[in-house]
């Protein structure tokens, strides 16, 4: 996984810098997400494994994407195809979106709770996280009844485990040591 991230980073950075310069970050995010979906298609997967010449692969890939991508994005896809890197397009798109959020001072927080949270609880979490992270926070909520009670919050590198399951686990670890 780290290798894919390392390979994808320069492509995502180049695309983001260019999109920022052109004031077209949103459209580039859409184009990269579309191209990533195409690359993940089960029909396309065998072609990305290297059985097709890079020039033909780029031509085919761009043809499939059609008018969904502009000329500059086509150039990026050609370079990636020449280097045998079209397979990392989903990681490029993901890193591009992360760069976009970082630039906009936004962060996506995953909230996993034992029960559904009320709108007041979500608002309080959002305000608290925005204050702590000094960024605008977008909450993605899910329910995991195995937590017993409480929440686990993940936002970037920050992980806060306030679940009963986590407390029991930490208590067990301290008793065993």
UniProtKB/Swiss-Prot annotation:
The record's section on InterPro entries has: ATP_synth_OSCP/delta_N_sf, ATPase_OSCP/dsu
The entry's localization annotation reads:
Cell inner membrane
Q: Which UniProt keywords apply?
A: ATP synthesis, Cell inner membrane, Cell membrane, CF(1), Hydrogen ion transport, Ion transport, Membrane, Transport
Instruction: Say yes or no: keyword Plastid present.
Output: no
**Coiled-coil regions listed in the entry:** none
**Where does it primarily localize?**
membrane
Q: Under the GO molecular function aspect, what terms does this record hold? A: proton-transporting ATP synthase activity, rotational mechanism
Q: How does it sit in the membrane?
A: Peripheral membrane protein
GO CC annotation = plasma membrane; proton-transporting ATP synthase complex
Q: Which Gene3D superfamilies match?
A: N-terminal domain of the delta subunit of the F1F0-ATP synthase
Tell whether Cytoplasm is among the UniProt keywords.
no
**Function summary:** F(1)F(0) ATP synthase produces ATP from ADP in the presence of a proton or sodium gradient. F-type ATPases consist of two structural domains, F(1) containing the extramembraneous catalytic core and F(0) containing the membrane proton channel, linked together by a central stalk and a peripheral stalk. During catalysis, ATP synthesis in the catalytic domain of F(1) is coupled via a rotary mechanism of the central stalk subunits to proton translocation.
Instruction: Quote the subunit structure annotation.
Output: F-type ATPases have 2 components, F(1) - the catalytic core - and F(0) - the membrane proton channel. F(1) has five subunits: alpha(3), beta(3), gamma(1), delta(1), epsilon(1). F(0) has three main subunits: a(1), b(2) and c(10-14). The alpha and beta chains form an alternating ring which encloses part of the gamma chain. F(1) is attached to F(0) by a central stalk formed by the gamma and epsilon chains, while a peripheral stalk is formed by the delta and b chains.
Protein family according to the UniProt entry = Belongs to the ATPase delta chain family.
Q: What is the name listed in the Swiss-Prot or TrEMBL entry for this protein?
A: ATP synthase subunit delta
Q: Which organism is it from?
A: Shewanella pealeana (strain ATCC 700345 / ANG-SQ1)
Gene for this protein? Answer: atpH
């Amino acid at each position: 996984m780290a290798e894919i991230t390392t390979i994808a980073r320069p492509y995502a950075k180049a695309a983001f810098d260019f999109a920022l310069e052109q004031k077209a970050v949103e459209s580039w995010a859409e184009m990269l997400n579309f191209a990533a979906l195409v690359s993940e298609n089960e029909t396309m997967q065998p072609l990305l494994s290297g059985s097709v010449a890079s020039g033909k692969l780029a031509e085919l890939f761009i043809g499939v994407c059609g008018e969904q991508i502009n000329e500059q994005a086509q150039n990026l896809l050609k370079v990636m195809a020449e280097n045998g890197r079209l397979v990392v397009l989903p990681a490029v798109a993901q890193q591009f979106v992360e760069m976009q959020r970082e630039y906009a001072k936004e962060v996506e927080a995953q909230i996993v709770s034992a029960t559904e949270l009320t709108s007041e609880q979500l608002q309080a979490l959002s305000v608290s996280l925005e204050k702590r992270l000094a960024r605008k926070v977008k909450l993605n909520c899910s329910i995991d009844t195995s937590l017993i009670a409480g929440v686990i919050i993940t936002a970037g590198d920050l992980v806060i485990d306030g679940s009963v399951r986590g407390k029991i686990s930490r208590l067990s670890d301290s008793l065993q040591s």
